[in-house]
């Protein structure tokens, strides 16, 4: 195995190890998010993007080269030509075909796992953010529920107070009705008393008029009696 393919194979093994490490169930996404949030990653972010694209290009080139080698050594004409020249050429061609196929698988899976690794890191980051947002939303929901319960309790208190106010209002209305009825009764009684007083005043005036008439009649009769008495006395004196 040449140095370049040994490096690609080592890169493939490292990718497999990282993918298995990311898939461990006892390491939560929040822990990976903290690791990804180190300041060193921010400093090499621009370099990392360039390196990512460079590695993809190199792996694509190696993959295409491996495809070319596989097609080259898989050709029937090449195998027959080598077999006709040297008897051991067939085994040599098959060995090169095996190496080409191995290199094809190494470069292909390295390219595939490299893309999977990038996507896996993105998904872990998004999952950690979603979990954090879920925690924040859970806290907000709990606070909202507490506030809603508090508002409901205050609403019940207000309803109870309103009911008490309504009861007091009904009592006040009943008392007001009673007072109005008492007022009407007092007005009726006052009117009756006023009518009775007016009638009594009229009776007094009538009696006063009658008394004056009787007094005048009495004075007239008394005057006539005096005159008659004087006449009688005068007649008695004349008869003597």
Swiss-Prot record:
It is found in: Endoplasmic reticulum membrane. One of its GO terms (biological process) is endoplasmic reticulum to Golgi vesicle-mediated transport. The keyword Transmembrane applies. Residues 1-6, 65-103 are lumenal. The chain crosses the membrane at residues 7-27, 44-64, 104-124. It holds the Pfam family Bap31. One of its GO terms (cellular component) is endoplasmic reticulum membrane. A motif (Di-lysine motif) lies at residues 237-240. Its main location: endoplasmic reticulum. The keyword Transport applies. Keywords: Apoptosis, Coiled coil, Endoplasmic reticulum, ER-Golgi transport, Membrane, Protein transport, Transmembrane, Transmembrane helix, Transport. It is a multi-pass membrane protein. Residues 28-43, 125-240 are cytoplasmic. Residues 166-232 form a coiled coil. Highly expressed in brain and testis; detected at lower levels in thymus, spleen, liver, lung and bone marrow. It comes from the Eukaryota. InterPro entries: BAP29/BAP31, BAP29/BAP31_N, Bap31/Bap29_C. Homodimer and heterodimer with BCAP31. Binds CASP8 as a complex containing BCAP31, BCAP29, BCL2 and/or BCL2L1. Interacts with VAMP3, VAMP1 and membrane IgD immunoglobulins. May interact with ACTG1 and non-muscle myosin II. May play a role in anterograde transport of membrane proteins from the endoplasmic reticulum to the Golgi. May be involved in CASP8-mediated apoptosis. Belongs to the BCAP29/BCAP31 family. This is B-cell receptor-associated protein 29.
């Amino acid at each position: 195995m040449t140095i370049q393919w040994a490096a690609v194979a080592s890169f493939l093994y490292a990718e497999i190890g990282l993918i298995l490490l990311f898939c461990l169930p006892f390491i939560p996404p929040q822990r990976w998010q903290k690791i990804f949030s180190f300041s060193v990653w921010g400093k090499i972010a621009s370099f990392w993007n360039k390196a990512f694209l460079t590695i993809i290009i190199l792996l694509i080139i190696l993959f295409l080269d491996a495809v070319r080698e596989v097609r080259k050594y898989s050709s029937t004409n090449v195998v027959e030509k080598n077999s006709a020249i040297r008897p051991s050429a067939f085994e040599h061609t098959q060995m090169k075909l095996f190496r080409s196929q191995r290199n094809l698988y190494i470069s292909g899976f390295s390219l595939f796992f490299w893309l999977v690794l990038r996507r896996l890191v993105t998904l872990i980051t998004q999952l950690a953010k979603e979990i954090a947002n879920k925690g924040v939303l859970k806290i907000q929901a709990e606070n909202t529920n507490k506030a809603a319960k508090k508002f409901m309790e205050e609403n019940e208190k207000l309803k109870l107070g309103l009911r008490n106010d309504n009861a007091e209002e009904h009592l006040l209305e009943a008392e007001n009705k009673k007072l109005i009825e008492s007022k009407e009764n007092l007005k009726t009684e006052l009117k009756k008393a006023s009518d009775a007083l007016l009638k009594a005043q009229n009776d007094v005036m009538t009696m006063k008029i009658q008394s004056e008439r009787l007094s005048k009649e009495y004075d007239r009769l008394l005057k006539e009696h005096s005159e008659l008495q004087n006449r009688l006395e005068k007649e008695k004196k004349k008869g003597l």
